[in-house]
Amino acid sequence: MTIRVGINGFGRIGRNYFRALLEQGADIEIVAVNDLGDTATTAHLLKYDTILGRLKAEVSHTEDTITVDGKTIKVLSERNPADIPWGELGVDIVIESTGIFTKKADAEKHIAGGAKKVLISAPAKDEDITIVMGVNQDKYDPANHHVISNASCTTNCVAPMAKVLDENFGIVKGLMTTVHAYTNDQRILDFPHKDLRRARAAAENIIPTTTGAAKATALVLPQLKGKLDGIAMRVPVPTGSATDLVVELQREVTKDEVNAAFKKAADDGDLKGILFYTEDAIVSSDITGDPASCTFDSSLTMVQEGKSVKILGWYDNEWGYSNRLVDLTVFVGNQL
């Protein structure tokens, strides 16, 4: 069954999601896009991307449509989710990627408009469930879970790492630092922002800031509630990030044992295709366009006094996340 999807918000994640489903060849039809920009701009930004390059498809537009390789997509421009006629358009699932309507009370307006499910491409509030693919998708209940969060890109990276460590060795506690590419929530030049550090020029500074990714891991691995915390360091690259996780384990381990656990998880089981494993000396640009949620860098594993372990996972914070959003769409759509 082809899954009929509407996208609300055609920004970085909305467009990356569109490209990812084309590349995956997923059985998903984009029926409509709702975005406040004009169709000429929407089509142009889909066709040309600074990071991913030119879309390998023919793109054209009219006043209220865009056409990609002969497939015409309706373009709407509604500010209020309640005004979008998803039901009339036959949309099954809405991708809520504006970054604005992350509360359940707002997101479920899409359901009132006729959609069956809403997938929020961000951490959410009061959502029915947060799902990190490869970690807790088995907890999904189609009868009761309608507003679903795909968590954050960083949670999608750190949760698989925490899952492997906790299942194999047991986590007592841990701290995380995400070395994160700058995003549209920062300023290109110094300009007011409620976070005074994010008010500073993104391409000229290393910017310490907050992240809820470590704590949010407990939403998908509840046994880790209260055990993890962390911060973010925003750095001057447009994409390509890394999660540095330091934990105290319940038992003593060696570097080889830790790496072997990650190698096994990457090769087999729920994390195959989601967690990658590398022994190469890579840098951030090497994972641009990488579909993994996390590429585990085995050469950087450190063990101190047996129980203190430091590991690092790379992730393309846009592309990897968007690929998981496609996976989640297929997962939920196949159970409609």
Swiss-Prot record:
Keyword presence, Nucleus: no
Pathway: Carbohydrate degradation; glycolysis; pyruvate from D-glyceraldehyde 3-phosphate: step 1/5
Superkingdom of origin: Bacteria
Annotated EC: 1.2.1.12
Compartment(s) where it occurs, according to its Swiss-Prot or TrEMBL record: Cytoplasm
Similarity comment: family membership: Belongs to the glyceraldehyde-3-phosphate dehydrogenase family.
Protein's recorded name: Glyceraldehyde-3-phosphate dehydrogenase
Lineage, highest ranks first: Bacteria, Bacillati, Actinomycetota, Actinomycetes, Kitasatosporales
Gene: gap
